[in-house]
Amino acid sequence: MSNRMWGGRFASGPAEIMEEINASIGFDRRLASQDIRGSLAHVAMLGSQGILPAEDVAAIEAGLKSVEAEIARGEFVFRRELEDIHMAVESRLTEIVGPAAGRLHTARSRNDQVATDMRLWVRDTLDALDAQVADLQRALAETAVKHAGTVMPGFTHLQSAQPVTFGHHCLAYVEMLARDRGRFRDARARLNECPLGAAALAGTSFPIDRHATAAALGFDRPTANSLDSVADRDFALESLSAASICAVHLSRFAEELVVWTSAQFGFVRLSDGFTTGSSIMPQKRNPDAAELVRAKAGRIIGALTGLLIVMKGLPLAYSKDMQEDKEGTFDALQSLSLCLAAMAGMVRDLEPVAETLKRAAGSGYATATDLADWLVRELNMPFRQAHHVTGRVVAAASERGIGLEELSLQDMQAVEAGITDAVFAVLGVENSVASRTSYGGTAPDNVRRQAEGWLEKLGPVEK
């Protein structure tokens, strides 16, 4: 039996495997709310333009709301033979209101319909993700205030570099997440044009009002070119790109948590709520939540790469290949949502081990730059010369197996006679971080001020 929605040209129905590969209802059912919103806006416009009689408009509107209620109650039956969410909704609408339902698709194609549905879904999801990113920023800023003066090692090449504070480290991620929110907002602004009314690809001969439909759905304007309207998936690609960059940021922090919670580092503790045990090793507390965030970043990046590859060879306008935009986009953006929730939970849960952090901050001659800066300030030494002198002092300490602050003044003066005992004041890690008062530096007062500024900017949690 041919499909009654489009089967007039066909004498028989599709092969079973054709039906299976063609159907998208298994995943695009999550567009049900957006599909019904689009149909309600479309039928209202058809009525206001005099294209449909008022009684048909009223019947269709009531029927669509009934379908929406059935879906919300879990009573709606999604059937594979109906292919997709558009035909599933229309089929049930026909059962409810009769032949009038067939008028709903006037001046519309599934091509512009699905493009509209996807834009609505991505827009809704970007708004939700933005709120989640803000919540993670808030958690990080709160931690930064609390630990503005908690000294820890700063790393380059995963080698001790210079002391920083735990709060300063948290604020680095607040800044990254701020850029992520900017990218989400940019993507949202560009996607906020309405394809509905572009029809299959060429527009329609009916006197529709696309501006009214766009306004009813909260879009800024209708899309300007009917071919581009149905051929475009830039909005999904751009959103996946922004999601991928955000996921990379989360993955970097997750990697640090995995390392920091290890017995070899012991920088932070996570509670039982964010760790799991081993089936054979009773002592284990594994940071599985952080590891899964790290893994899901790859999954999100994979969705972006996959859709880029799908789109790269498609001629205008619509091809069935574009049905493959949905699963990856749905999965990636929902995976990011899960990662954001997990990271916010871990940030609020984690407990820095201050003594371990402080001890590690002083290892690896991390205050060597402070010594070089002291030589520049106090002895008026060119920095390149100070760098060389400091390197020789570090070598002397390393040969003795001691820290810089443990090296005797006599040993330092053997390298540079002008060094005085005043140098020891800059070799402690607290003094080191306190001295970094330049804008954006790790001085505790800077960190506290910036963290409080972020909390003010972010505002309270929205209920």
UniProtKB/Swiss-Prot annotation:
Pathway: Amino-acid biosynthesis; L-arginine biosynthesis; L-arginine from L-ornithine and carbamoyl phosphate: step 3/3
InterPro entries the record matches: Arg_succ_lyase_C, Argininosuccinate_lyase, Fumarase/histidase_N, Fumarate_lyase_CS, Fumarate_lyase_fam, Fumarate_lyase_N, L-Aspartase-like
Superkingdom of the source species: Bacteria
Disulphide-bridged cysteine pairs: none
EC number assigned by the record: 4.3.2.1
Location(s), subcellular: Cytoplasm
Leading EC class: lyase
One Pfam assignment: Lyase_1
Assigned keywords, A-Z: Amino-acid biosynthesis, Arginine biosynthesis, Cytoplasm, Lyase
Keyword DNA damage among record annotations: no
GO molecular-function term, one example from the UniProt record: argininosuccinate lyase activity
HAMAP family xrefs: Arg_succ_lyase
Name assigned to this protein: Argininosuccinate lyase
Organism this protein belongs to: Methylorubrum extorquens (strain CM4 / NCIMB 13688) (Methylobacterium extorquens)
